[in-house]
């Protein structure tokens, strides 16, 4: 919400592509962190714990081979970490004496952070503590993080106390006394968390835990485990660490003044533009401003005022206009009284699931690439200029033989995303 219009209900901040790579392409925070983890010499086995709504987007940005542990519903960090730990042990076959390092995917970090993660894992493997936390040296009195009060100022020390997210004045006092940010980065042996989990939850293994997940108490890992653990170590980290959760912090991390088609004249000062549309944005005479455009909407704001956007976004009541899926993406082009027009892009080798609709007809027009459609069990090849009609009730899917662009027109009095019945013969992905 705070990064509207780039983020929305199904696309959170970690998926926004604003970081320019050496090849000129842009990547998101999750792509950046995932790439950093893959470069580690330890050859870590990486699994992403996430909600069901984010799986397609993760596969779109990281590939379909990435390991994902899916929460059936949101139950806070303790159940999520226990579920992921059980997944690593029971599904992936990782031994109880192996170490897991937990870290968020959305901070802005540099290469020294990934080196620090390896050190964190090595400390946990050494067995000097049941939990090893990364304490981040604060750069300002943040109200967004909890704080760790270490027992000393050594690179690795014990933990004296843990503090909840404070107000700015209290945070200043914590920092004066040597407190560190608690960024939610820690390491442990799988057996330790599984043992703690069995003390608090009645379950037999991953499958049983997954079935009972919706009944679990909503409780944080800090409260359930960290604050009660006496054998704990804190490893200091003094490198770059930023939460890019506001337009101010996001634009500070941008390597250039604009992303996407935009022009700024010489009178602009401290202005950043992120444009996901195909039409250009021209800025003249602006100061301390952020301009952002996406299919979801357009924001023009003073940077300081951009933090107060939430109540205005809540009033827009606009449907999701763009989404990335494991098979590609779609963008809403036009919303009519009895029609919805969408541009669909499928990656080579990908396909929609085999499905039907009861209250709408659909028409596909291929505008780029080659593919294969299946209509009520009958398959045929399609290419540029081909039109496929699908009346309500017929089962249909389309597979991309090359990258495929299709204009989809939905026709009906009551067009609803829930009007969809999956059938055997297609992929398991949500279209």
Enumerate the language-model features and the residues they cover.
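Conserved N-terminal catalytic core of the sugar/cofactor nucleotidyltransferase
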Residues: 5-9, 19-104, 108-115
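A structural signal for isolated positions on well-ordered beta-strands in alpha/beta enzyme cores
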Residues: 45-47, 101, 132-133, 233, ...
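Left-handed beta-helix
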Residues: 188-388, 394-397, 415, 420-430
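Residue-level signal for inorganic ion chemistry
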Residues: 15, 30, 84, 106, ...
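C-terminal structural segments of small proteins and small subunits
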Residues: 407-415
